[in-house]
């Protein structure tokens, strides 16, 4: 029986991946450290496997070599016949799928935690591709309780179409941790320490789940993706303005109709023309310029999360 997201079996095969983007340095250096010092990832019921996801991009200190690895874990790419001309990240995605998957099968890892940094002022943010996943909701709530001085928000992002494509989608369940702001190619000590502590708390939560702890019901706020907004551009694609100073660094804060979002190079303000309040995130993220994204929009909703029952003694036994 597979330990799928809604199942009642312990999570024994866990991976922590860093360097999916080779210039997001907290995950890069944590993965490198743990590969040499894996004891920090050990818990009584499991030992998480550290993985440096994109070693070529990491060596070059670039987001990727040929294409974004974190957009490459679709069944089309994973199931394609390998050729010498394949982009590096397609080859690497297939290797990672063999190591941690195969995606969509009972042989896949139980859980992948994928580590990222952003240049945007998001603070700590968990990204879940599975809407209303009770395990991930309880995980986020646990982090909020364990780290009251570091707000941790949950962003629900369901990719367009029907298939997920991220690194953590290879496992039966998974989540991405974003921490910012940190410039590309730079390692900031306070963010390195914060990410390290959050990974420890996530592994502690999995251990408590495996040991049969019951987690009570609660209410929480989540941010649900509403799409993206591009920069103002000329017809040939060049920017004609940039993110307004009133919006810059205000991730997860309310953006109301009529408030400025861009400052044109000619001096005029561009105002938000939506008909309701939204909550922007990944504002002016450096890596998203090529994706024609100035920021993402989200709606903040409050949800009631049911209790996560404890596992039965028989199901908590390790093999």
Curated annotation (Swiss-Prot):
Its EC number is 3.5.1.114. It is a peripheral membrane protein. Zn(2+) binds at residues 21, 24, 116. Signal peptide: none annotated. GO terms for cellular component: apical plasma membrane; cytoplasm; cytosol; membrane. Coiled coil: none annotated. Residues 1-210 are annotated as: Hydrolytic domain. It catalyses: an N-acyl-aromatic L-alpha-amino acid + H2O = an aromatic L-alpha-amino acid + a carboxylate; an N-acetyl-L-cysteine-S-conjugate + H2O = an S-substituted L-cysteine + acetate. Its cofactor is Zn(2+). It holds the Pfam family AstE_AspA_cat. Residues 211-318 are annotated as: Shielding domain. InterPro entries: AspA/AstE_fam, Aspartoacylase, AstE_AspA_cat, Aste_AspA_hybrid_dom. Keywords: Cell membrane, Cytoplasm, Hydrolase, Membrane, Metal-binding, Phosphoprotein, Zinc. GO terms for molecular function: aminoacylase activity; hydrolase activity, acting on ester bonds; identical protein binding; metal ion binding. Binds 1 zinc ion per subunit. The keyword Disulfide bond does not apply. It is found in: Apical cell membrane; Cytoplasm. The keyword Cell membrane applies. Substrate binds at residues 63, 70-71, 178, 288. The modification Phosphothreonine is found at residue 318. Plays an important role in deacetylating mercapturic acids in kidney proximal tubules. Also acts on N-acetyl-aromatic amino acids. Exists as a mixture of homodimers and homotetramer, both catalytically active. PANTHER family: ASPARTOACYLASE, N-ACYL-AROMATIC-L-AMINO ACID AMIDOHYDROLASE (CARBOXYLATE-FORMING). Belongs to the AspA/AstE family. Aspartoacylase subfamily. This is N-acyl-aromatic-L-amino acid amidohydrolase (carboxylate-forming). It comes from Rattus norvegicus (Rat).
